[in-house]
Amino acid sequence: MIKNTFLGIGPMSVEIIDSLDYFSKKFKKKIMLICSRNQIESDKLGSGYVNNFSTKQFSQYVKKKKNKLLIMSRDHCGPFKRDGNKKNLKKEIENCKISLLDDIINDFKILHIDTSECGQGKYDVAKELMDYCNEKAKNNDKKIFFEFGCEDHGILTNFKKFKKDAKFLSNFPNRQFIVCQTGSLVKSIFQIGQFDIETVKIMKNI
């Protein structure tokens, strides 16, 4: 497990990446750069909108900063999670594997697997993707950690579903995070949700 992670922020522009580099060095905080597939993507799948970076180019840009406090991470990788034309499930899984392999080779450390669009097959697809990642990480002598799950923002987590997610994730020794919702929801610069501390306490115990 990667300890003492401070915050996860999407690298939506080069300016944001540079600012996070400055902040993490100044305050000595670990920052996770959580890249959606729209933002940063394998060149085999068209690259991303952030400076038109491919996964490799993004990784090279971050590594040039020589900042071990910046942790490259993948956010919401799963079938039907990228904008554009949607493929059939088999093709979507193939594309996810292409994307994840590039992540692993280019030293992304935390991989968020989100199969929430796969219906009743979500755990089977997640297992396939996570087993694939572990195999490729081992073959390439890389160390990775998993985040798993997805919920609609601003809606409190369903405890029954959360328990199932937690049980599934417990099968992977290199787990890092599980997704749960607290009721908090920020839109623009405003907090329009309601943080529920009692719900958070229950989920923590689960």
Regions found by a protein language model. Name each.
Residues 13-15, 37-39, 76-80, 115-119, ...:
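Active-site-proximal loop/turn and secondary-structure-junction residues that shape catalytic pockets
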Residues 31-33, 111-116, 178:
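Hydrophobic residues within beta-strands of alpha/beta enzymes
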Residues 3-13, 109, 122-142, 152-206:
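Active-site capping/gating regions of soluble enzymes
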Residues 73, 112, 147-150, 179:
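Generic enzyme active-site microenvironment
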Residues 1-92, 98-100, 107-109:
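Alpha/beta catalytic barrel-like cores
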